[in-house]
Amino acid sequence: MEGSKLLPCVHKSPVPTSHQLYINYEILGLTKLKKHKYTQNKMSSSDSSSAESRLATAKTVLTTAASVAATAMLARSLVQDYLPDEVHHYISYGFRSIFGYFSSQMTIIIEEFEGFAHNEVFEAAEAYLATKISPSNKRIKVSKHEKENNYNVTVERDEEVVDTYNGVKFQWILHCRHVESKHFHNPRDLNSTLRSEVRSFELNFHKKFKDVALESYLPFMVKRATLMKQEKKTLKIFTLSPENMYGNYSDAWTSVTLDHPSTFKTLAMDSDVKTSVMEDLDKFVKRRDFYKRVGKAWKRGYLLYGPPGTGKSSLIAAMANHLNFDIYDLELTAVNNNSELRRLLIATANRSILIVEDIDCSLELKDRTSDEPPRESDDIEDPRYKKVTLSGLLNFIDGLWSSCGDERIIIFTTNYKEKLDAALLRPGRMDMHIHMSYCTPSTFKALALNYLEIKEHRLFSKIEEGIEATEVTPAEVAEQLMRNDSVDKVLEGLIEFLKVKKIENEQDKAKTEKQELENKKKTKEGTDSVVKKEVDEQLVRNDRVDKVLEGLVELLKAKKIEDDQDKAKHEEVEQH
């Protein structure tokens, strides 16, 4: 139509019915469901593929690790079997250096021994860590001697103990390894040669706390351990164990608990001598700085001499109880040579008493100045079969080796002081000589107080008179005081015993004098025969009479000098 505008043609869809809407919604739902299932299947396929990938990766890692481990084991075996020890150590050091460069930890190794001597830090750590054992530790060592009151708890090997000091964590591990000796078989172990245990502690901490560990923590631990050991210390007496002589020398000393009841309060000896000994001991243990200032080794020597039964062993036990020192009983005949003696003595601990009983009988100590030719046994080349010499013993008592230890007491005992070499007796070796005499009235009163619990009795005066007139030992008097529970009967029996003992003394004295006269007579006869033989030899030495007579005069002069020297020496011994 003219003048009319053309409008765009718009297609209008028919309005869907409700049935058509339902079908469309159903189709749409099925489509979404298919899409959801497709997505799930795709994700499931992806997860399965990822798991397989991870499993393959794990297998690859394990295979690689096994290959590396096998290669490392093979390399280690080749290094140990075919490379010299020097190269082996060099390679090990290189690997440790590489791994240590990237580590923030520092390790301190504390071995049980420093050369021949005990390592004080190791002993302190062993005592200190016993108080740091926690429930996380699975293995510990516990021991107890029959007469000890406390259990000894120590860390078992390869156990880790953690300690915290001023907020810093320190990790301790005990390492042990056994070294077998082929020189000696231990009769207590039928399956192996003698085993010697080498022990060490490993201390780990962050390397930035190095100064704290060395300058503060370790000194604190040593001081704390020393106090702990003194508080719970049980006295011990050590003796040599021959079957352990060829391992560590500390293992050669075996100990038992020392439960000796002797004290200075109960000790029956002269009261003045007892007081003097106690004061000397107390002064010795308090003078550490003094010995250091004057340049002397911190040690003290005592010589106990006197007849058997006068209380030498009881005095040693009283000294140990007074100072709380362990005792090392050294049997010199069990030691093969000077080197072995030196190592055994160095293995003894500080704050201890070393005793050599009956030193005049325990070993033939040859005088260093003697011109006596060596015996056949002295020419044996193997040093293990050469005996201890006087020189070797003296070198440890006051030589350079005497400074290898602190707060030590050395005690020699003998029944016959005059038999000892003078070199053993001088100050610096045996500083104090203590004469353990026969029983005196004061000794008897001490015994009566200990055994009978009495201070006075009407029979004391008679007993004291008998004791002054008789050579009787405190041990013999003590035996009489134990004969009866009745005080009167005991003291009356002691009076009768002293009478019998006095008669025995007189008989022994007469017998001794008779023996001395016979010995002098034999000596004179032997001297006369020697002189006659020497004169005969002198007379045939020359054809000229004047030369013979001159030689004879010189011989007689020399013999007179020898006789004078022998006489002076005999008088000196008698006077002593």
Swiss-Prot record:
Binding-site residues, ATP: G306, P307, P308, G309, T310, G311, K312, S313
UniProt GO molecular function: ATP binding; ATP hydrolysis activity; identical protein binding
Keyword annotations from UniProtKB, A to Z: ATP-binding, Hydrolase, Hypersensitive response, Magnesium, Membrane, Nucleotide-binding, Plant defense, Transmembrane, Transmembrane helix
Region named Disordered: 508-532
Signal peptide limits: none
Superkingdom as given in the UniProt entry: Eukaryota
Class of this enzyme: hydrolase
Ranges annotated as spanning the membrane: 55-75
UniProt entry tagged with the keyword Glycoprotein: no
Induction, as annotated: Accumulates in response to flg22, thus being a FLARE (flagellin rapidly elicited gene). Up-regulated by the Yariv phenylglycoside (beta-D-Glc)(3). Expressed during hypersensitive response (HR) mediated by the bacterial pathogen Xanthomonas campestris pv. campestris. Slightly induced by the virulent pathogen Erwinia carotovora subsp. carotovora. Triggered by benzothiadiazole S-methylester (BTH). Accumulates in the presence of 2,4,6-trinitrotoluene (TNT).
Topology in membrane: Single-pass membrane protein
Known cofactor(s): Mg(2+)
SUPFAM superfamilies: P-loop containing nucleoside triphosphate hydrolases
Subcellular location(s) of the protein: Membrane
GO cellular component, one term: mitochondrion
Pfam families the UniProt entry points to: AAA, AAA_assoc
EC identifiers of the protein: 3.6.1.-
GO BP term (any one): cell death
SMART domains: AAA (SM00382)
InterPro entries per the UniProt record, alphabetical: AAA+_ATPase, AAA_N_dom, ATPase_AAA_core, ATPase_AAA_CS, Mitochondrial_chaperone_BCS1, P-loop_NTPase
Annotated catalysed reactions: ATP + H2O = ADP + phosphate + H(+)
Family (UniProt): Belongs to the AAA ATPase family. BCS1 subfamily.
Subunit structure: Binds to the Yariv phenylglycoside (beta-D-Glc)(3).
Protein's name according to its UniProt entry: Protein HYPER-SENSITIVITY-RELATED 4
